[in-house]
Amino acid sequence: TPVILVHGYGGNSANFLFMQWRLKWRGWGNVYSVSYTPPHINARKLAQQVNDHVERILASTGAQKAHIVCHSMGGPLTRYALKNLGLAGKVDRVITLGSPHYGSRIAGLFPAQGSAAQMRYQSPFVQELAEGGSCPGGARFFSIYSNLDNFVLPVSTAVLDGAEANINVPYLGHCALLYSNRVLDQVERCLLSPKPEV
């Protein structure tokens, strides 16, 4: 099953170089880091790019489903693609790192347009995304976050309703989540965790 890494606002695929290398070193063979651009356009258009990357990787590998690891805004974009763009049933697990699932107050501190404005706390976009359940598309969801994340405010916005697990890895900043071995250990646990008995 391919593991696809989706960066956050203003980033690119290089943000995941450390995690991509470490996962490969730990034996995960098919790890792909993707980019979407430009960050200031509508989040729905960015989610379409995420959707297209996943579809392309599934087609090239012949896999039926992918695992997706997302940082920051990559989480809401992936959830949108699962809910609205046809990824439902094609993703096994979604693991988010410091994702503002219900928006962040930081995004309201400056004039913003496009996806940045859509990431404001309790914005119409994030409220619409949560309607009918925050974990769409039949995927298993895990949210990893930190109590000291300086971009995801309040911290509770990183706690995803309906997720299989919400995991606090304390004392890490927003970008430090990408480079922490403690986070990497949790990501791997989520990737390996057996499906819960019904």
Residue ranges and their predicted role:
Residues 4-14, 22-137, 144:
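Serine-dependent carboxylesterase/thioesterase catalytic core
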Residues 1:
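Alpha/beta-hydrolase fold active-site loops
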Residues 178-191:
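Post-His helix in hydrolase/transferase enzymes
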Residues 192-198:
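Generic C-terminal helix-cap and adjacent flexible tail
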Residues 43, 172-181:
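Catalytic histidine-centered segment of alpha/beta-hydrolase-like enzymes
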Residues 147-152, 174-175:
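Acidic catalytic loop of the alpha/beta-hydrolase fold
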Residues 138-145, 165-167:
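Catalytic His-Asp charge-relay segment
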Residues 15, 151-156:
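Conserved alpha/beta-hydrolase "acid-adjacent" motif
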